[in-house]
Amino acid sequence: MDNDYESPWGLSQLEAPADSQNIDSQPLNDDELGINTEVQVKRTRHVAKLDDTRMMDDKGLPALKHLCTKVNLKGNGHEVGDLGRLLDMYQMWSHDLFPKGQFKSLYPLTSKAGRTATVRGLRLAWIDEEQRKKQTADVATAVDELEDITDFRDRGRHFETEPRYSRQSEPPVETSVNVDNPDDLFVGMDSVDHRLVSDEDVDIQAEVSRREDDEDREQDVSELLEGARAQRDKDNSRSSGRLSLFDLGGSGSPSESDRGGSTLEGDIFGTGSLDPTPPPASETSTQAPAAQPPATQPPQAPAPTQPPSNQAPVKAPPQPMRQMDDLELDMLADFEPDFEDQEQHEPEPDPEDYEDDEAMAVMREMGL
C-alpha cells in the first residue's frame, strides 16, 4: 500500500519537487484558452401574444364581426360548402391578426384568449345589442299592424255612415255643405286634412266605384237579354199554329195550281202583310178557257203548226224567290226537320255560342 505522504501533491510547495513547479509556470496561448474565438448567440424569436389588447384592436374581434356579415351561408343541404366558407373567413382574419403565424396555431390561441373577462364582457354586450334590435323591430311591426287595423276600422265606420247610391236610383238632393279643403276625398270631412289621406284610401274608393258600375252594367245587359228572349219566345208561340215554309212555295202539286189555289211566299207569321203571288204568264196561256163565257172571250189566232218531231217541249220559267230577312231565317231554322244521324252530317252548335251572339247583338244595339 502506497504512502500518501510520499505523493507529490500531498506535500507542501516547499517540499514539492522542482519538476512540478516548472510545469505550472509555463505561459498558455490565447487561442488555447478560446478568448479570441467568436461566440454565436442565438436570439430567441419574439412571438406576439394574443392578449386582450390585440383582441380589442381594429384587426381583432371588430374585424371578425365585420367579416361575419359578408359570409353567405346556404343552410340545409350545403353543410360542406358552408364549413369551407367559415374556414376561409377565419383564415383571412388570422392572417391579418398574425401575418407570419400559422393557421394551425390559431385554435389554441383563440380558445385561450376567449376565456378572459374582457372578451366575455364584449360578447355579452353584442348579444344584448342584437336582442334589443330584434325587440325594437318586433314592437315597430306590432305598432304598424295596430295602426293599420285602427285606420281600417275608421274607414269602415265612415263607409257605414256614408249613403250609397246606384245608377238606377234617384239622384240625392244637393245640400250646401261647408267644405274647408276642396281636395278632401269625402264630402263633409272638414276636420280631416287632405294631406293625411293616403293613396290606399283613394284606391279603395276607386275600386268600390268601379265594381258598382260593373254590377249596374251587368244588370242592364241581363235585363235586355231577358227581354230579347221573351220576345223570341212570343214570336215562336205565334208562329206555331201557322203554315210552315215546307207547306208553301214549290211543295204544292200541279193539280192544286190548276184548281186555282193561290200560294204564299214567306208568310210564316200569319200577318197577312204579303200578297199572294199571281200565277206565271206561261201557265195562264196554257190553261183552257172553258170557265169563261164564250161571248166575252176574244178570238185567238191559230198557233203555227210545226212538226212534232222537231219541236222541243216548252218549259215554264222559274218563279222568282223573295229574299228573307234575318227573323224569318231564324224561324226557318226552328222548323227544319231533325235527322236521325244529325251528329254524323254536321256537329251540333253549342248553346253558349248562341247566347254569346245574342249578348253581342244586344251590346251592339246599346252602342257599347
From Swiss-Prot:
Its main location: nucleus. Residues 1-33, 153-358 are annotated as: Disordered. InterPro entries: Csm3, TIPIN/Csm3/Swi3. Residues 213-223, 326-341, 349-358 have a biased composition (Acidic residues). Residues 153-167 have a biased composition (Basic and acidic residues). GO terms for molecular function: DNA binding. Keywords: Cell cycle, DNA damage, DNA repair, DNA replication inhibitor, Meiosis, Nucleus. Disulfide bonds: none annotated. Residues 291-307 have a biased composition (Pro residues). It is found in: Nucleus. GO terms for biological process: DNA repair; DNA replication checkpoint signaling; meiotic cell cycle; replication fork arrest; replication fork processing. GO terms for cellular component: replication fork protection complex. Residues 19-28 have a biased composition (Polar residues). Pfam families: Swi3. Forms a fork protection complex (FPC) with TOF1 and which is required for chromosome segregation during meiosis and DNA damage repair. FPC coordinates leading and lagging strand synthesis and moves with the replication fork. FPC stabilizes replication forks in a configuration that is recognized by replication checkpoint sensors. Belongs to the CSM3 family. Component of the fork protection complex (FPC) consisting of TOF1 and CSM3. This is Chromosome segregation in meiosis protein 3. It comes from Yarrowia lipolytica (strain CLIB 122 / E 150).
